[in-house]
Amino acid sequence: MKIIYYSNPYFADCDFPLIKELREQGHQIIYILLFTKDSLKSTLIDINTPYPQNGIFKPDIYKELNIYKDFIGYNDTYIINNVIPQKSIFEKIKFAHKVIKFINSFKADYIWTTRPFQKEEWPLYFFNKVALTIHDPFPHSGENLSKEKSLNKKIALNFSKKIFILNERLKNDFCVKFKVSPLKVYTNKLGRYDCIKLFHNDQITINKKPYILFYGRISPYKGIEYLIESFLKINKLHPELNLIIAGSGKLYFDFSPYKNIKSIELRNYYINMDETAILFNNAEFIVCPYTDATQSGVIMTAFTLNKTVVASNVGAINETVIDHQTGLLVKPQNIEDLSNNISLLYTNKKLRSTIEENIKNIYSKGENSWENITKQYIDSLKK
């Protein structure tokens, strides 16, 4: 198939291996990555200086992307650089027209996007078959869509020919809430976030004591306050164990009582990929104490490195974390259950080793491999 894959840096960690596999299976993929001033530091992308011109370019305008050149390939890969705000609606429409004309010139079988189009881009729905991947079908706690984003989502759901969500459990609720026909909604899953294996920097400082890791953007639904309280209970029994909390975002709770606790380390900034790789590789395991969620890219990053997780049993997390097989599931917002399971996984090395071997076998081949995930996508697009 000939597909335009139109996405943004926020999903690069799961998009890059998907694009790689699609191309390896012989499909012509025109990969278009939209850069805005707010997306220059996100997931795999760590750009310090924006290219000082809006337009459509090859990826080599950003040297920071060169590490991925051999992984995804630069043929048929483009950057829409929209980092300089347009001063008027006329400029916005003019730029959008240029993008639409460029996209339409490929005459693709599908435009496959991970983002509802902005209103200036709406004509793309009328002249193309559009497939939409929705990573988060419902807003997280403490996060609400603006009126503009809600409208863009409504238009996208109405006019997209195919809609993909990344778990089975939420499909029915999604269709009911947004009044979408189940016939055009297809489910799939995330695969391994393989790009993390490209990174390793021994010069980044890391705690030499054993530690468990919370990683990801800090937001109210992440449940970090429950993790800290659980860890304090564990730390009395295992004073050698540390907790690292790593991620950008505004702290939504009072961290000051924990500031001087030496066994708790807060890295509250954008974590680049070198540091991410070091943190994951050296952690005992990862903890995802979410109060609500759909699926989790953090879990897939952990699984890529065969690291197990302790995760709250919320949303569709249990489709990925199978209790005592690929991780441990705990009751959300339950400090006792969380601390018990963290202690179990920390002290039971045999259990951890068994789980890590399961992860390796399940995600390197079979139905959870990118090869199978990609074939499912193509089969859905052909229906």
Where are these regions (language model features)?
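Membrane-proximal helix-turn-helix segments that form the acceptor-binding/catalytic region
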Residues: 97-104, 146-166
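Donor nucleotide-sugar binding/catalytic pocket of nucleotide-sugar-dependent glycosyltransferases
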Residues: 159-198, 373
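Conserved donor-binding/catalytic core segment of Leloir-type glycosyltransferases
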Residues: 205-222, 228-231
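A short, well-ordered alpha-helix in the C-terminal region of glycosyltransferases
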Residues: 240, 337, 344, 351-366, ...
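Nucleotide-activated donor-binding/catalytic signature segment of Leloir-type glycosyltransferases, i.e.
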Residues: 254-277
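Acidic donor-binding loop of glycosyltransferase active sites
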Residues: 278-294, 307
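Short hydrophobic beta-strand element within catalytic cores of glycosyltransferases
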Residues: 308-311, 321
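Conserved acidic donor-binding segment of nucleotide-sugar-dependent glycosyltransferases
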Residues: 323-324, 328-335, 342-350
